[in-house]
Regions:
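N-terminal secretory signal peptides and thylakoid transit peptides that target proteins
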Residues: 1-18
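C-terminal segment of classical bacterial N-terminal signal peptides
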Residues: 21-22
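Beta-rich carbohydrate-recognition and catalytic domains
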Residues: 25-115, 119-185, 193-248, 256-307, ...
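Beta-strand-rich binding-surface signature
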Residues: 189
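Predominantly extracellular/luminal carbohydrate-interaction, adhesion, and secreted-enzyme modules
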Residues: 310
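Conserved active-site neighborhood of enzyme catalytic/cofactor-binding cores
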Residues: 313
Length: 348
């Protein structure tokens, strides 16, 4: 999900303290990607009437048939739609157009539809190939009930495709009103993992529909992709204590297997309005301990990510980790929101 103008009014934030787990219970050195490319690899078109006219956001990167692909969320003033881009080297990207459009005739997809994840290999250092089920690729999406930028209480659903270009979005399977108090305000970015015959649907959610609110990350499970059970121990990635770097948001999960453990990449938002990417690790898919420090921090004034460096998507290639994220800065007094990347090895 994204930070809009209302969510930047942090002067109104009280010193609310939600359940927190301590930092520093894991070592994130092997997951570090300190070498930023320093520019956007995917940008808004700036062309009025185009689906990506105002911003591109929310990357999900994978490999397929010998190439790399990225789904991304585009905003045109009405709502989100989902685009696809391709690359041979994870740096030079070409947009291929819209793959999941809003549908004015649909009560669910009328204003927006944002594909956040497609079921892929679990391994962090795997090629990141997709995992078809019954001849279809499985994706998970988020939608919002009103026109505008993430307006209203979001919901999550499952979508299917045979070719990655045309998607059939089924009705939502997770709704905020069916959840606990921490998620009653609306659901955000989904992440779908299959392990030992069980599907795990990770998502972040907010406790109030209207600002101010807090966001945390939880998980639901299913065998059939239809009947989902929320984990009793949610949220599995809660907000940190007052003064921490994820005091306000702990959001946008990207969950991958790192050997015998799981890595839960996510972004945190602090009370000053700074958004950064972090990671937690755990022995299974329902327990996570936060690692100390940011994996991707904001850059200095004038840099591509001087305002926000958030919303992780991680893939490995030739032994290197590539950490894609939404980079936000100000250019000529206007927000420049696009996709950038950092990796584990220097670029030169």
């Amino acid at each position: 999900m994204s930070i809009d103008l209302t969510r930047r009014e942090f002067a109104t934030i009280g010193a609310l303290a939600l359940g927190a787990r301590s930092w520093g219970q894991c070592n994130a050195d092997r997951l570090a990607t300190p070498y930023k490319l320093g520019r956007q690899v995917l940008s808004a078109s700036g062309q009025q009437g185009q689906f990506d006219s105002l911003s591109v956001d929310g990357p999900f990167v994978f490999s397929h048939e010998g190439r790399f692909y990225m789904t991304f969320i585009a905003f045109d003033g009405t709502g989100y739609q989902t685009g696809l881009a391709s690359s041979a080297n994870l740096v030079d990207w070409k947009k291929e157009g819209v793959i999941l459009k809003r549908d004015p005739s649909s009560p669910t997809l009328r204003y927006s539809v944002a594909l956040g994840w497609i079921l892929r290999e679990n391994g962090l250092y795997s090629p990141g190939k997709l995992k078809p089920v019954d001849g279809h690729f499985l994706g998970v999406y988020q939608v919002y009930p009103s026109q505008g930028y993430e307006i209203g209480a979001g919901m999550i659903g499952v979508a299917r495709s045979k070719d990655l270009r045309q998607w059939d979005a089924a009705p939502p399977v997770l709704r905020p009103e069916d959840g606990a108090e921490w998620e009653r305000g609306g659901l955000y970015k989904p992440c779908l993992v299959e392990s030992e015959g069980t599907y795990y649907l990770f998502y972040n959610a907010k406790n109030h529909t209207d600002w101010p609110w807090r966001e945390q990350t939880g998980v639901a499970t299913a065998k059939d992709l239809k009947s989902w059970t929320r984990f009793a121990g949610n949220p599995i990635i809660p907000n940190g204590p007052p003064g921490s770097m994820d005091e306000i948001f702990a959001s946008d999960p990207c969950v991958l297997q790192d050997g015998s453990r799981w890595a839960f990449f996510y972004y945190g938002l602090d009370a000053k309005g700074v958004a950064r990417d972090f990671v937690a690790t755990g022995p299974d898919l329902t327990h996570a301990s936060k690692c100390a420090g940011a994996l991707i921090d904001v850059g200095p004034p004038g840099s591509v990510d001087s305002e926000y460096a958030h919303k992780p998507s991680v893939i490995a290639w030739k032994g290197d980790l590539y950490h894609f994220y939404c980079a936000v800065s100000q250019v000529n007094g206007k927000e420049a929101r696009g996709i950038s990347v950092a990796r584990s090895r220097p670029w030169n």
